[in-house]
Amino acid sequence: MRIFYGLLAFLVARQHDAQAIQARSDKEQPQTVVSGTAVQSVVPVQAQLGSGMGPSSSSSSASSASGGAGNSAFYPLGPNVMCSFLPRDFLDCKDPVDHRENATAQQEKKYGCLKFGGSTYEEVEHAMVWCTVFADIECYGNRTFLRAGVPCVRYTDHYFVTTLIYSMLLGFLGMDRFCLGQTGTAVGKLLTMGGVGVWWIIDVILLITNNLLPEDGSNWNPYV
């Protein structure tokens, strides 16, 4: 019974770690690189709120407050924010490009990942990706830009809890290895009935210690 509760506590901890990596990446202050012509520097507020502001200057300020991309300068008190400051919920971002450890290609393109995967935040590489603002969202500046701080991880259909259940209940048939895409190893495990039980137990331990991962290099999917 103690072993069952211990495994249950470990499962909860693993799920929390996977969600923490994504949450910490989302909460970090995003750094953006705007493509094309750089946006002009912010107009001082004092220049817009001078003591001699009359009716004509009021209408001029109202026009500037619309903050469209066609204006020559960004009005900080207007209704529009910089497109590059928008949260991820308002952006359509492409998946990180896999350069397959080709540092030269990454330096030339200025975006993409050298490697994917990692169990902790420090192990996961973060890279730039191209993002585009959704069509119905109004903002100031270029609507397509590079956004930094995106974690280099892939999520497929591999779930840790499901794989662990397969390993504990059907591990002697190699079901866990089949689930991870390791077909050759799974057949060997099936023919030997889980290595007469020894291989079965070892794979359960490897899963719990995060030393047995999907064959395609993806991370455990934290989303159900």
Curated annotation (Swiss-Prot):
It is a multi-pass membrane protein. It is found in: Membrane. Pfam families: TM2. Residues 157-205 form the TM2 domain. Residues 1-18 form the signal peptide. Keywords: Glycoprotein, Membrane, Signal, Transmembrane, Transmembrane helix. Disruption phenotype: Viable but females are sterile. Reduced adult lifespan. No morphological defects of the eye, wing, notum or leg. Eggs produced by mutant mothers fail to hatch and embryos display neural hyperplasia. Residues 176-189 are cytoplasmic. It comes from the Eukaryota. Disulfide bonds: none annotated. The chain crosses the membrane at residues 155-175, 190-210. The keyword DNA repair does not apply. Glycans are attached at N102, N142. Residues 19-154, 211-224 are extracellular. One of its GO terms (biological process) is positive regulation of Notch signaling pathway. GO terms for cellular component: plasma membrane. InterPro entries: TM2, TM2D1-3-like. Positive regulator of Notch signaling. Maternal neurogenic factor involved in Notch signaling-dependent neuroectodermal specification during early embryogenesis. Functions cooperatively with amx/TM2D3 and bisc/TM2D1. This protein is named 'amaretto' after the sweet almond flavoured Italian liqueur because of phenotypic and molecular similarities with TM2 domain-containing protein almondex. Belongs to the TM2 family. This is TM2 domain-containing protein amaretto. It comes from Drosophila melanogaster (Fruit fly). The lineage of its organism: Eukaryota, Metazoa, Ecdysozoa, Arthropoda, Hexapoda. The gene is amrt.
